[in-house]
Design a protein with these regions (language model features):
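Amphipathic alpha-helical repeat scaffolds of TPR domains
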Residues: 1-12
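Helix-start (N-cap) detector for alpha-helical repeat units in TPR-like alpha-solenoids
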Residues: 3-4, 38-39, 72-73, 106-107
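Residue-level recognition of tetratricopeptide repeat
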Residues: 11-12, 46, 80, 114
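Structural signature of tandem alpha-helical TPR/SEL1-like repeats
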Residues: 15-29, 50-63, 85-97, 119-131
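Short, charge-rich amphipathic alpha-helical segments embedded
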Residues: 30-46
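Terminal, low-structured helical/coil segments at or just beyond the last alpha-helical repeat
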Residues: 110-140
Length: 140
């Protein structure tokens, strides 16, 4: 109950005040009340990622994935982070899983394509990009 309130306050720190430090303090408070609160781990990870604190962000996403291996947001955001820090194999594994968990997510297919291109899999990358493009066309 209270952990959720701190999560919401953390989200407001980002959306209203653009204050990442205050947001992280609220996510930490939520996690002190409920260490298994996956949404708080993910939001903290995203906030750290956006602040370019990649090591700490990856630790948050790793915790979230270990708590719930089939959580799309946890797997997708860790894959996105791994692509950013050039852990291409890790990114490929996560983004492949993310596209399986949520096949309708265009962004996951696009990033999966980007990761595949980095290891020279141009044909597979093009397939993922085409899927992303088709999904975006459907939405508009």
């Amino acid at each position: 109950q209270y952990a959720h309130e701190y999560l919401l306050m953390g989200n407001e720190c980002i959306t209203q005040a653009h204050d990442a430090r205050a947001a992280i303090a609220n996510y930490d408070k939520a996690l002190s009340l409920d260490p298994n609160y996956i949404d708080a781990w993910i939001r903290k990870g995203i906030t750290l990622f956006n602040s370019k604190e990649y090591f700490d962000a990856e630790n948050c996403f790793n915790t979230a994935v270990s708590l719930h291996p089939a959580n799309f947001k946890a797997v997708y955001n860790r894959g996105k982070l791994r692509l950013k820090i050039d852990n291409t194999e890790g990114a490929i594994a996560d983004l492949d899983k993310a596209t399986s968990l949520k096949p309708e997510h265009a962004g996951a297919h696009e990033l999966f394509g980007d990761a595949l291109l980095r290891v020279g899999k141009e044909v597979e990358a093009a397939i993922q990009w085409r899927i992303a493009e088709e999904l975006r066309k459907k939405k508009s």
